């Protein structure tokens, strides 16, 4: 199943990339646990990491701080490694309201969630790839540190089928039911099976376009074939096939019965404690809820909120870390932490927030104390589990620098020859009028401007002032969701308006080559928003334009300003020297605007079957670019119904065309959600 990693790129490493690749590889081969890649905006950090993965041939997990950047990285890695397993592992909830209790108003909030089936399938595909192959890149969000089914139990539950194997049809059906597959002879969809005589068709939970046909003859597996679940066309026959459980949380029956006994013991102990403290209501509530859950587990093998009993189901002791995606990563795996200055603090904060909510539930009798062990990893547990790690950032945090010691690999030179912006410091007194004249100069030559303020009030007032003076301006604030934010950025790039005003929203991962000016108001007010890292990140937003310039408005130069200006000058000088030595003239980036949201259109093209379908699919995707996630989901459901209708009418060509369009829309939905 595994193939060697094969990097697909029209470019060869250049600038600082060859040296960065060599140093990172040497460090990994020498057994260094931590290294940092200090890569400036536009220097091709992802390309460098892709080269390291391809050269060392090691399974890799890439951690991103949010779904937007994870989707962007997934698209890029998919293009770099089209022949290998590039997987996507983020939270599969479209909406999630955890159960909670508010003592002040005596309000209990039930858990409420809506699961995205397509992302659930991608998560299952990611763990399957990690268990089966070596040529795997999993792009994950911080969801990777949350509890997942135990890999040992997951492996024990798998159903292995081989040609010539002696097995009764009923035994196969019973095993499929244990894997939580359901029988459905009418609608054949993911996670179901159907039976026709001695033929069993199984639609694997981790697959979206291939199903398995098991043909039996007198209790012997005669043939295993892979077929298209839509058209019924057989793609190939295979000598063996492994069917994975429908969910990561599936547990063998004997383990459930054992866990139930342990839950009863804990309930008895907890009841004594509550009664001793005269907490009669809490004792009654806990007994009632737990007995109901035990009844459900006995009858069905699972219950609502079964994750709260995960400690017993995975056979772990009190306080032990839960099984996570890291347990599926091979021992010689590689971890890449993207935008590490944001991702690392995020990992540290997840456990504490989760703990506070659960302690209230335990105290008031809604959950047993063991529910506290259904949690994300603590930071020290993450450190213990993490394999060899490369931190990637333009502004690494103190943690990464401390861990890496001297192993900070500089990637300052851009292959395009683009220089870091020229920085000017101007007085605060005339900042608004000065900014207005700068905006007019940029708007006249069809370039864009980003303005960052310190407060929401100032951002609103400035937006109003610029509008009154006839400028085309938009204000990007924290209430705007990810998708609307992406739409605003796209409109800025398309020239629907010239100026974007924001507070802390103009930093990581915004790729806007049209922006030639970044204005930072009140740059001399020392603090989080005007720290050295924040300033370098914000200045970097103008580093993708040939005429890039940053104006810092301040009456004095603070230590943070001095460091940010010094670092930017250092990078600029190094790039200038490289350009002179190699005769490079800086080239502006000509990145297509649809690239921001049209996640990996090449993915859809490679999946589309038949000539010309890739082009029509991509076109269909662009039409959908301005749709909200809700509208996209609605569109996906409509198309799925149309596709099934065509298949039932035996109109397989039309059904296949709709399926190709669905691939594109699902990729868009990932980028947008």
From Swiss-Prot:
ATP binds at residues 39-46. SMART domains: DEXDc (SM00487), HELICc (SM00490). Keywords: ATP-binding, Cytoplasm, DNA damage, DNA excision, DNA repair, Excision nuclease, Nucleotide-binding, SOS response. Residues 431-597 form the Helicase C-terminal domain. GO terms for biological process: nucleotide-excision repair; SOS response. CDD domains: DEXHc_UvrB, SF2_C_UvrB. Coiled coil: none annotated. The keyword Coiled coil does not apply. Residues 26-414 form the Helicase ATP-binding domain. A motif (Beta-hairpin) lies at residues 92-115. Belongs to the UvrB family. The beta-hairpin motif is involved in DNA binding. Forms a heterotetramer with UvrA during the search for lesions. Interacts with UvrC in an incision complex. PANTHER family: UVRABC SYSTEM PROTEIN B. The UvrABC repair system catalyzes the recognition and processing of DNA lesions. A damage recognition complex composed of 2 UvrA and 2 UvrB subunits scans DNA for abnormalities. Upon binding of the UvrA(2)B(2) complex to a putative damaged site, the DNA wraps around one UvrB monomer. DNA wrap is dependent on ATP binding by UvrB and probably causes local melting of the DNA helix, facilitating insertion of UvrB beta-hairpin between the DNA strands. Then UvrB probes one DNA strand for the presence of a lesion. This is UvrABC system protein B. It comes from Salmonella typhi. The lineage of its organism: Bacteria, Pseudomonadati, Pseudomonadota, Gammaproteobacteria, Enterobacterales.
């Amino acid at each position: 199943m595994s193939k060697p990693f094969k990097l697909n790129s029209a470019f060869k490493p250049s600038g600082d990339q060859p040296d960065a690749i060599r140093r990172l590889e040497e460090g990994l081969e020498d057994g260094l646990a931590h290294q940092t890649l200090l890569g400036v905006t536009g220097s091709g950090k992802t390309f460098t990491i892709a080269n390291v993965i391809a050269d060392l041939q090691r399974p890799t997990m890439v951690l991103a701080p949010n779904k937007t950047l994870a989707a962007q990285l997934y698209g890029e890695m998919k293009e770099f490694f089209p022949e290998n397993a590039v997987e996507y592992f983020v939270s599969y909830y479209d909406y999630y309201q955890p159960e909670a209790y508010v003592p002040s108003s005596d309000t209990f909030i039930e858990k409420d969630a809506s699961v995205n089936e397509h992302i659930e399938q991608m998560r299952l595909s990611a763990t399957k790839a990690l268990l089966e192959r070596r040529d795997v890149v999993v792009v994950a969000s911080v969801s990777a540190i949350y509890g997942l089914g135990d890999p040992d139990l997951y492996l024990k539950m798998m159903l292995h089928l081989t040609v010539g194997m002696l097995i009764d049809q009923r035994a196969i059906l019973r095993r499929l039911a244990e894997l939580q597959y359901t029988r459905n002879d009418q609608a054949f969809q993911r996670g179901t099976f159907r039976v026709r005589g001695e033929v069993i068709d199984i639609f694997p939970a981790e697959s979206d376009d291939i199903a398995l046909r098991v043909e039996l003859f007198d209790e012997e597996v005669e043939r295993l074939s892979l077929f298209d679940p839509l058209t019924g066309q057989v793609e190939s026959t295979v000598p063996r096939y492994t069917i994975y459980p429908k969910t990561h949380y599936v547990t063998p029956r004997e383990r459930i019965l054992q866990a139930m006994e342990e839950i009863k013991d804990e309930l008895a102990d907890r009841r004594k404690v509550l009664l001793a403290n005269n907490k009669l209501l809490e004792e009654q509530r806990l007994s009632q809820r737990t007995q109901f859950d035990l009844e459900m587990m006995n009858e069905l093998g699972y219950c609502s909120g079964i994750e709260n009993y995960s400690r017993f189901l995975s056979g772990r002791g009190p306080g032990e870390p839960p099984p996570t995606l890291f347990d599926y990563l091979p021992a010689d795996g590689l971890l890449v932490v993207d935008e590490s200055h944001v991702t690392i603090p995020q990992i540290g904060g997840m456990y504490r927030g989760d703990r506070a909510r659960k302690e209230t539930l335990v105290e008031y009798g809604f959950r047993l104390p063991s529910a506290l062990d259904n949690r994300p990893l603590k930071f020290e547990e993450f450190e213990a589990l993490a394999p060899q790690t490369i931190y990637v950032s333009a502004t690494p945090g103190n943690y990464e620098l401390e861990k890496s010691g001297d192993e900070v690999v500089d990637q300052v030179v851009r292959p395009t020859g683009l220089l870091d912006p020229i920085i000017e410091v101007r007085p605060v007194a005339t900042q608004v009028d000065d900014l207005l004249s700068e905006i007019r100069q940029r708007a006249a030559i069809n370039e864009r401007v980003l303005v960052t303020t310190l407060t929401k009030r100032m951002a609103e007032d400035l937006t109003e002032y610029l509008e009154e003076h006839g400028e085309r301006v938009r204000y990007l604030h924290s209430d705007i969701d990810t998708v609307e934010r992406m739409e605003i950025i796209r409109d800025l790039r398309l020239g629907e308006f010239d100026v974007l005003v924001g507070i802390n929203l103009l930093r990581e991962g915004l790729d806007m080559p049209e922006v030639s000016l970044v204005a930072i108001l009140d740059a001399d007010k020392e603090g989080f928003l005007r720290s050295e890292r924040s300033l370098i990140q914000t200045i970097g937003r103008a580093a993708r334009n040939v005429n890039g310039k940053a104006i810092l408005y301040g009456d004095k130069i603070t230590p943070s300003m001095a460091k940010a200006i010094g670092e930017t000058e250092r990078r600029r000088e190094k790039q200038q020297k490289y350009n002179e030595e190699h005769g490079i003239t800086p080239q502006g980036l000509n990145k297509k605007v649809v690239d921001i949201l049209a996640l990996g259109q090449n993915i859809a093209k490679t999946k589309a079957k038949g000539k010309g379908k890739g082009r029509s699919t991509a076109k269909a995707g662009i039409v959908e670019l301005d749709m909200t996630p809700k509208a996209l989901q609605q569109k996906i459901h409509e198309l799925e119904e149309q596709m099934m209708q065509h298949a039932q009418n035996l109109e397989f060509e039309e059904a296949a065309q709709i399926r190709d369009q669905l691939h594109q829309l699902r990729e868009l939905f990932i980028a947008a959600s």
